[in-house]
A protein has these predicted regions:
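Exposed alpha-helical structural elements
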Residues: 10, 51, 98-102
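Active-site activation/catalytic loop segments of kinase-like enzymes and analogous catalytic loops
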Residues: 2-43, 60-79
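Charged/polar, solvent-exposed surface patches and flexible loops
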Residues: 13, 37, 54, 58, ...
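Generic alpha-helical secondary structure signal
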Residues: 26-29, 50-54, 81-84, 88
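ATP/Mg2+ or Mg2+-diphosphate-binding catalytic cores
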Residues: 63-107
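All-alpha amphipathic helical-bundle segments outside canonical DNA-binding/catalytic cores
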Residues: 44-59
Length: 107
């Protein structure tokens, strides 16, 4: 599969699926500032921090879809405990970041 998407999607997937919840909560804003500065330093027309934050809040839904799809497959793709934990972590990230509300605001 090939897709094209903004880099913040990958950031959101990583932070909300692979990073421990408490660490993500404590560090995500600083990490996003570093990400934005890295884009600027590389000569990329980076979005303003508040726009990047809004995009991040929406981007985490991709990770939630991946986690819930994996969990729904039972143990066919990976041990069920792994899939269920990933789903819990991703669901918490969406709740923390008010992802549904972020989509409402965008629409």
């Amino acid at each position: 599969m090939i897709s094209r998407s903004p880099g913040i999607r990958d950031v959101g997937i990583y932070l909300c699926n692979s990073c421990p919840t408490e660490l993500r909560r404590a560090e995500q804003e600083g990490w996003l500032r570093s990400y934005q500065q890295g884009l600027v330093d590389a000569g990329v027309a980076a979005p303003a921090p508040e726009i990047l934050w809004r995009r991040y809040r929406r981007a985490v839904l991709y990770g939630w879809v991946a986690a819930t799809t994996t969990a729904a497959m039972g143990d066919r793709w990976q041990p069920i405990e792994v899939g269920m934990k990933a789903m819990r972590v991703a669901t918490q990230a969406c709740a923390d970041l008010e992802t549904v509300e972020a989509f409402r605001e965008a629409l």
